[in-house]
Regions:
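Arg/Lys-rich, positively charged N-terminal/basic patches that mediate binding to nucleic acids
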Residues: 1-41
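Charged, solvent-exposed alpha-helical segments that act as regulatory interaction surfaces
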Residues: 30, 34, 53-57, 98
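Gly/Ser/Thr-rich beta-alpha loop segments that engage phosphate groups in nucleotides
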Residues: 35, 60, 93
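Enriched for short, Lys/Arg-rich terminal
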Residues: 81-107
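Hydrophobic pocket/interface hotspot
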Residues: 17, 44, 89
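Conserved N-terminal glycine/acidic-rich loop preference
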Residues: 16-24, 67, 76, 100-101
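Basic/aromatic recognition patch in beta-strand/loop cores that engages polyanionic ligands
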Residues: 45-46, 56-87
Length: 107
């Protein structure tokens, strides 16, 4: 799966979010196998496309940084920014992760 840019789908994936996706893919494959990994990654891709069409559906996360949005998906939370007619996927965190530590440790 190509996790760089999908401008035709209305979203871009930052380097940090690509690293998160790779970690999710590795973990999923080790614990649940390739088929489940592929299903979950495909469901994330569909979520990104849906968020690109419905960017305001997410929760504003100005508590983290101005302009951040989040939307839950499975065991993870998708973080993104609205950039004109597109969204930028900026991070994918497990729902149990410390959000502030995640974003501030990667600045």
């Amino acid at each position: 799966m190509n996790w760089t840019e999908k401008p035709d789908a209305g979203y871009r994936i930052t380097r940090m979010a690509r690293e998160d996706l790779l970690g999710i893919a590795r973990y999923s494959e080790i614990h649940w196998g390739k088929d489940q990994r592929n299903r979950y990654l495909k469901s994330l891709e569909k979520r990104f496309e849906w968020l690109a069409l419905n960017p305001k559906a997410g929760r504003r996360r100005d508590d983290i940084a101005n302009g951040y949005y989040s939307f839950p998906h499975g065991q993870h939370v998708v973080f993104y920014l609205i950039s004109g007619q597109m969204i930028d996927i900026i991070g994918l965190l497990h729902k149990e992760m410390d959000i502030l530590v995640y974003f501030h440790s990667r600045e």
